[in-house]
Curated annotation (Swiss-Prot):
This is SPbeta prophage-derived uncharacterized protein YomR. The keyword Coiled coil applies. Keywords: Coiled coil. It comes from Bacillus subtilis (strain 168). The keyword Coiled coil applies. Residues 9-36 form a coiled coil.
Length: 405
């Protein structure tokens, strides 16, 4: 290395050394200042803690909330105690300060009365007027002997001298009637017309005892909430009444009879309604059927016939085409002249089968048959024919019975 470069490097090293020396001085100064500040804060904190400790030590107002139980005085009441003078005064009080009664000291029967003096007692003991003498005692004892005779005579008196009544001897319910003799009693015992035999008793005890109605003949059960469950909770043969508002009840109020098997899996209910209708319902293997109305002959015989409405040129043949609904069926009767494969007449939908129906009808003018379609909307039409001579057909006999369901 040349001398000039050496000198330059030396100067640079001196500069760095001086710089490090200055940094070290500043760090040392900072540490001294920090140490002094920390010392001041520590002194202040110690002084504060000493003051707080002194305040706590001087606090006499139970700062730790110590209870009387914690110091073993849980049973002591917070009441003013008597002074020694007051206690001594009470101890020396002979005027019954606690209001002790004579019963409490075992003298409940003693009266609060003045007792006789010894002189008064002696005077009383020597009083021959109040007390009897020996001769008087002898006289009175002799009188007692006479009294015993009177007593014995009275005790032997069997004519009810004290007028004792039947009620007083516990026989108030008995009447003063003549009693049967032994012969009469035995004859009554042997009377088999008035008394039942053991065979008769067994027969009557084995008779049916279950009620089917109330004592006055009215329904035994009144169904108000659930027809099915209330019937199943009734005896196996029951006369019942019901409210139409009950679940599963018929549409009108009425009365009926219920009969079922012992296990209540099979049964029948039949009801007569207040509006003169009859319904029945079945229980089959635990499953209930719907209500079925029983139609009377008068209802079937007296249902009026109604005329159909013709369409598409159809007309009456030998008889007008009529319809009616009887016992869940549609009845059609008449002779109609019409073309096939067209709607030739209509009836109201409430008279029509819900799923529609097909029936076979006879033709007129020749031998043959055609199909009658009764639609669920009430339309009637004929379709297809099988006849000896289809050209000779003059009409169709519509005489059929169609189930509505």
């Amino acid at each position: 290395m040349s001398s000039s470069k050496y000198v330059g490097q030396l100067k640079q090293n001196n500069i760095q050394i001086n710089s490090l020396r200055g940094s070290n001085d500043r760090a040392e100064k900072h540490m001294l200042e920090h140490e002094q500040a920390l010392t001041e804060k520590t002194n202040l904190f110690m002084e504060y803690q000493q003051n707080e400790l002194k305040k706590h030590t001087d606090d006499k107002s139970n700062p730790h909330l110590v209870t009387k139980e914690q110091v073993g005085l849980g049973n002591v009441l917070n009441n003013v105690q008597a002074t020694k003078e007051e206690f001594d005064e009470h101890l020396n009080d002979t005027l019954n300060p606690h209001s002790v009664t004579k019963s409490q000291v075992g003298l409940a029967n003693v009266l609060n009365e003045k007792q006789a003096t010894k002189t008064e007692f002696d005077q009383h003991a020597q009083d021959t007027i109040i007390h009897i003498t020996a001769s008087e005692r002898t006289t009175w004892n002799a009188a007692e002997s006479n009294s015993k005779k009177y007593t014995d005579a009275h005790s032997q008196n069997t004519n009810n001298p004290h007028k004792v009544t039947a009620i007083q001897v516990g026989l108030g319910n008995l009447t003063n009637d003549k009693q049967a003799t032994k012969l009469e009693f035995d004859a009554h015992i042997k009377d088999n017309e008035r008394h039942i035999t053991s065979t008769e008793r067994s027969k009557w005890n084995s008779a049916q005892l279950t009620k089917i109605s109330s004592d006055d003949g009215q329904p035994l059960v009144s169904i108000t909430s659930d027809f099915h469950s209330e019937l199943l909770n009734s005896p196996t043969l029951t006369y019942f009444g019901y409210d139409k508002a009950a679940l599963e009840a018929p549409p009108s109020n009425g009365r009926g009879f219920w009969t079922c098997s012992a296990d209540k899996l099979y049964g029948q209910a039949i009801v007569l309604t207040n509006d003169n209708k009859t319904y029945r319902k079945s229980l089959i293997n635990g499953a209930w059927s719907s209500w079925e109305r029983l139609i009377s002959s008068s209802e079937i015989d007296n249902v009026p016939w109604l005329s159909v409405t013709y369409k598409n040129g159809a007309k009456t043949g030998s008889r007008p085409l009529q319809y009616r609904k009887v016992a869940g069926t549609l009845q059609l009767s008449g002779h109609v002249v019409t073309n096939r494969d067209v709607v030739f007449a209509s009836i109201p939908t409430e008279f029509s089968p819900t799923q529609g129906a097909v029936k076979s009808v006879e033709v007129s003018g020749t031998f043959g048959r055609s199909k009658l379609f009764v639609n669920s909307n009430g339309d009637l039409q004929l379709s297809g024919v099988s006849a000896d001579n289809s050209a000779a057909i003059t009409g169709y006999y519509i005489d059929v019975v169609v189930p509505l369901n």
